[in-house]
Amino acid sequence: MKTMKLLICILCFICFNSLDNGLGLKPQMGWNTWNKFWCGINETLIHDSIDALIESGLVDAGYNYINLDDCWQKYRDDDGYILYDNDTFPHGIEPLVKYAHSKGLKFGLYSSAGNYTCQGRAGSLDYEEQDAEVYAKWDIDYLKYDNCYNRGISSLVRYPKMRDCLNETGHPIFYSLCQWGQEKVATWAKEVGNSWRTTGDISDSWDSMINIIDENDKWYKYAGPGGWNDPDMLEIGNGGMTLTEYKTHFGLWCISKAPLLIGCDITNMSDDIKKILTNSEYIAINQDELGEQGHKIKRTQIDYPPDYDPDVKSSRLELVNCNGKKAQKWYINEDGSLRNNNESLCVDIPNCAKDDSTVSTFGCHIGGETYCDASKNQEWDYTADKKIQSRMEYPDGAKRCLRVEEDTLTIVQTHLCNESNTWEYNETDHTIKSNGKCLATMVEATEVWAGNLSNGSYAMLLLNRADTPQKVEISWDEIGFDNKTLKLRDLWEQKDLGEFNDSFSVSLESHDSVFLKAEVKEPIPPETDTDGPEDDKDNHKVQNIVMIALGGVIAICIGVIIYMYIKNRKSKNGENEERDRLIENNNN
């Protein structure tokens, strides 16, 4: 009985405490105001952007959400209901929603799971039920839910609460968790939202974009139809990267099954940018029915000649073979900074994450009071027992130290300090070593990203992360297609490349990529005689054996069910007889 009750409780928890809105079966596609306009939004811009989404061909390509980010709201009325900013939206939000719907589009809004939004407008914490009621009344289709001013309350409390309130309205609303990747959100968010941010905010630069997709990649196993890893919105068209880099940006988001939310001014978009954003074959990979997130399967470190030493860059930290380059030189300073090559980049815990977090180098801001934790996320101590220990305070009172991730054995993260977290710091050559390898900012490399598609096909993106031209190669045995012939198609050029027996290689310029779709060429089976009478007899024997075995399994299952039912009834009858006996004794 206890086992049965436990099973019922688990089933009830899954059924009644999960997101069940039927949305997000494929990564969402649309446009968002934030990356380009920040708070500079108004109803004219939104109206014009609805028109532009249609006239530019973006809707035909699959983009169907128009999403207002922060600053559409102002404060609350006396009853606690959210009010729109009537200075910038004098006619309110509902007319814009109706206009979008009349054009076949969907409409989204933004809030934060805190007292305030990130720009200081009224947040939704403690007002979840009222806000969900308003969103449903306005016929909203999408909610981006941020993480600012959260009072230190766990995301596992705040985000499910809004989910439940949205569900209670009976109005399907796509629920996008903008939670910055904290508290290992990817491991639990599929029961809460339709997508979840795995990282901090993106900016319009190559370094930011490539570091963010690296961080997103580690969670690839948790994405799939109904819920997606979100490395933030697209920066394509905002001017901070080259067209080549934007093409790679789009390819990486597509193969990673990331949400495709345009972040540029679509009312003033160049043909080159539109060509990237509307590439139908890239988008088809992103929207593939299988919904399997592609991920990094191969990384080849570039072996530069001794006389070439690339400049250090803001990036994740990793453990690599020692080579004496600047990327492997570190200075531990009295102010707590751990500086790469003693320059302006410091080892940083992004967003002061309180759980195990991948660390990176970031612009030094030691002592800056306006940064999270008053910049303690960039302060470290090299202890007597050879640990690199963060000066940040953690809720459990325990300290965190740098260590190498157990899954990758190369990526460096914070973790509870223990005996395995030791590092050797050499004050002469300024290397920091673990197990004979050197701590480094992520060195330049070539990579292959890949993933399965529906109908047995395969997607591959070959990438050159280096600042110099490089050759990138992939062998079929590295992706499980030993002794196979693959038919390859270039998705950018939208043309077939032919058949390749063992491998494929390509020379790529700096930050360029080639996006491929691969299909296995099946060998033509040799001609054989049709099955004769003896073969038919053998086939019938096999079929009979299978049917007998299947019947036995079904009979066992039915027997178990009947047994559990009889046992349950006997238990109840026994309880009833005992109750009747007690009543009779009391009456006597």
Model-based region annotation:
Residues 499-529:
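C-terminal beta-strand-rich structural cap/linker in extracellular carbohydrate-active enzymes
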Residues 253-263, 443-481:
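Carbohydrate-binding surface patches
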Residues 49-152:
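Aromatic-lined carbohydrate-binding/catalytic grooves of carbohydrate-active enzymes
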Residues 553-568:
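Single-pass type I membrane-protein transmembrane alpha-helix
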Residues 127-130, 168-265, 452:
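Glycan-recognition surfaces
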Residues 296-445:
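Lectin-like carbohydrate-binding module/patch detector with strong preference for beta-trefoil
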Residues 570-588:
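Cytoplasmic C-terminal tails of single-pass
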Residues 529-550:
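Extracellular juxtamembrane-to-transmembrane boundary of type I single-pass membrane glycoproteins
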